[in-house]
Amino acid sequence: MGCRLLCCAVLCLLGAVPIDTEVTQTPKHLVMGMTNKKSLKCEQHMGHRAMYWYKQKAKKPPELMFVYSYEKLSINESVPSRFSPECPNSSLLNLHLHALQPEDSALYLCASSQ
């Protein structure tokens, strides 16, 4: 088999969070091939008006990917189109993934703020 068939992007999500957290991210771990389509869900229950998705590669600081604030979605222009956000309401910010590349292997983090 060719290298492309064996290649997969490993997406690790923050798993060490306090039990009483009001921001949840699911699934906590995700391994997917380059042709799969998956979604990451970020949900907050604090009434915050802003939500964020970050990408953090090994030994690098987090990079802001998307912001949903006051019912407006802002997209970092450097984020490839294989990542697409969806905000069905002010407490959810989903991240849809498709056709990932090996360089997409990273820690994906969601957050919220007032």
Swiss-Prot record:
GO biological process, one term: adaptive immune response
Chief place of localization: membrane
Pfam families per the UniProt record, alphabetical: V-set
Glycosylation sites per record: N76, N89
Domain Ig-like: 22-114
Gene Ontology CC: plasma membrane; T cell receptor complex
Assigned keywords, A-Z: Adaptive immunity, Cell membrane, Disulfide bond, Glycoprotein, Immunity, Immunoglobulin domain, Membrane, Receptor, Signal, T cell receptor
Compartments (UniProt record): Cell membrane
Cysteine disulfide partners in this protein: C42-C110
Domain of life: Eukaryota
InterPro entries: Ig-like_dom, Ig-like_dom_sf, Ig-like_fold, Ig_V-set, TCR_beta_variable
Coiled-coil portions: none
Keyword Cell membrane: yes
Secretion signal span: 1-21
Keyword Cytoplasm among UniProt keywords: no
Function, in words: V region of the variable domain of T cell receptor (TR) beta chain that participates in the antigen recognition. Alpha-beta T cell receptors are antigen specific receptors which are essential to the immune response and are present on the cell surface of T lymphocytes. Recognize peptide-major histocompatibility (MH) (pMH) complexes that are displayed by antigen presenting cells (APC), a prerequisite for efficient T cell adaptive immunity against pathogens.
Subunit structure: Alpha-beta TR is a heterodimer composed of an alpha and beta chain; disulfide-linked. The alpha-beta TR is associated with the transmembrane signaling CD3 coreceptor proteins to form the TR-CD3 (TcR or TCR). The assembly of alpha-beta TR heterodimers with CD3 occurs in the endoplasmic reticulum where a single alpha-beta TR heterodimer associates with one CD3D-CD3E heterodimer, one CD3G-CD3E heterodimer and one CD247 homodimer forming a stable octameric structure. CD3D-CD3E and CD3G-CD3E heterodimers preferentially associate with TR alpha and TR beta chains, respectively.
Protein known as: T cell receptor beta variable 4-1
Organism per entry: Homo sapiens (Human)
Gene expressing this chain: TRBV4-1
